[in-house]
């Protein structure tokens, strides 16, 4: 029993039992990213042991696709497939057997202003005008770079953004962090107010919000991202292991991820690995 003998087990998405193409892709990308992060941590090359019959497979997330990604990452791949009939397992589900794939992988940003509840009424009015206007300017800059959020929402001291990929989300999160740290004029905030920013990535359900009329996203991965934010240190950006893995798999070398350990998340969401996001060189 390989699973029973494993030293550790990662569950990429414990919130859903849906078997679709996105689930296979998500798990495969996290596998690749975690392998790359571990190789970087150990300052060694990435070597992969694979069991593959040499067949093309059925697309993204399959064995052939994973091997192609490993080779693209510069990994050494050793195939230990014995080629004997007794070692061939039952055929896995094909994409034709899977449920419809309507949950794209998206990156989720939650941010909260610490100290907001202690502001006076006139300070809240200034915060709403200056701070949120400044955030809107950051969104405009992201749009010019082709990295604008797919959805955005705010409620007083909270921000929620959804991005297409980890690169766009990481760049925006660090720009927001820097603007608050440096007390940029357009992001004027009282000194007692600090920002916490959290990032996570996973399959989500897109929908058109019938109340606002704008695109939005829902699902347990959205809730998971929200539970990271309360444990983030002030004026820092923290990310889930899934986000760090997907960023590593995508080859985002301009960022670094400092492992903070396994942390209890807010509202009894369990213990999960958390990383601090920084620019490389910080």
PLM feature spans:
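Defense-system signaling and execution modules centered on TIR/cGAS-STING-like, death/scaffold domains
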Residues: 42, 72-109, 114-116, 129, ...
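Catalytic NTP-binding/metal-coordinating core of nucleotidyl cyclase/transferase enzymes
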Residues: 97-179
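A generic structural signal for short hydrophobic patches within well-formed alpha-helices
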Residues: 116, 169, 204, 243-244
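Catalytic core of nucleotidyl cyclases, primarily class III adenylyl/guanylyl cyclases
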Residues: 142-168, 183-220
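Cytosolic regulatory/linker segments at or just downstream of nucleotide-handling modules
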Residues: 234-282
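Acidic/glycine-enriched connector segments
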Residues: 1-90
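Short, charged, amphipathic alpha-helix that recurs within catalytic cores of restriction-modification
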Residues: 221-231, 244
